[in-house]
Amino acid sequence: MKHTLSVLVEDEAGVLTRIAGLFARRGFNIESLAVGSAEQGDVSRITMVVPGDENTIEQLTKQLYKLVNVIKVQDITETPCVERELMLVKVSANAPNRAEVIELAQVFRARIVDISEDTVTIEVVGDPGKMVAILQMLAKFGIKEVARTGKIALVRESGVNTEYLKSLESKF
C-alpha cells in the first residue's frame, strides 16, 4: 500500500540529504517527493509517497524521528486531507487534432500554457487520479513529455471525508 507522509523539518542545509540517505540505507523507495516552506519561515514541509505495509511505515517514522532536524512525522494516508499535484504534459497536436486536444484539456479543467505548430502543452492540477485519467485520454495523440511535481497534502481541519467530497465533485 502507498502511504503519504507529511514531515516537518528545520529548514537547514543537508536535511533532505539525510532523509534520502535514511531511505536508501534501509532500501525503501520514495515514489513522490515535494518540499517547500511551511507556515513558519524556518520550517519546511516534506510530503512523500512511500510504498509499504503498516510495520514498515511505523519503522520509517521511528527512524525519521531519530534525525536531528525532524520536528514532526505524520502518516496522513487515512486522514481526511486535501491532495494536489501539478503536471505539465506536452502532446502532439497538429492542426487537424489540436481542437480535440484543447477540448479534452477543458473537460479536465486544465490550462493550455503553450501551443506550437506541432504540440500543445497542458497544465493539470488535481489529485493523482486526475493525472492518470488525463494521461490515458491524451495517449492517443502522442505524449511527447511529462513533468510532474510530487503530491502535496494538508490535513482537513473540518474532518470532512475526502471520499465523500470526491463523490460530490464528480457530480458537478
Curated annotation (Swiss-Prot):
GO terms for biological process: isoleucine biosynthetic process; L-valine biosynthetic process. It comes from the Bacteria. CDD domains: ACT_AHAS (cd04878). Pathway: Amino-acid biosynthesis; L-isoleucine biosynthesis; L-isoleucine from 2-oxobutanoate: step 1/4; Amino-acid biosynthesis; L-valine biosynthesis; L-valine from pyruvate: step 1/4. Its EC number is 2.2.1.6. InterPro entries: Acetalactate_synth_ssu, Acetolactate_synth/TF_NikR_C, Acetolactate_synth_ssu_C, ACT-like_dom_sf, ACT_dom, AHAS_ACT, AHAS_small-like_ACT. GO terms for molecular function: acetolactate synthase activity; acetolactate synthase regulator activity. Keywords: Amino-acid biosynthesis, Branched-chain amino acid biosynthesis, Transferase. Residues 4-78 form the ACT domain. It holds the Pfam family ACT_AHAS_ss. GO terms for cellular component: cytosol. The keyword Transmembrane does not apply. SUPFAM superfamilies: ACT-like. It catalyses: 2 pyruvate + H(+) = (2S)-2-acetolactate + CO2. Dimer of large and small chains. Belongs to the acetolactate synthase small subunit family. This is Acetolactate synthase small subunit.
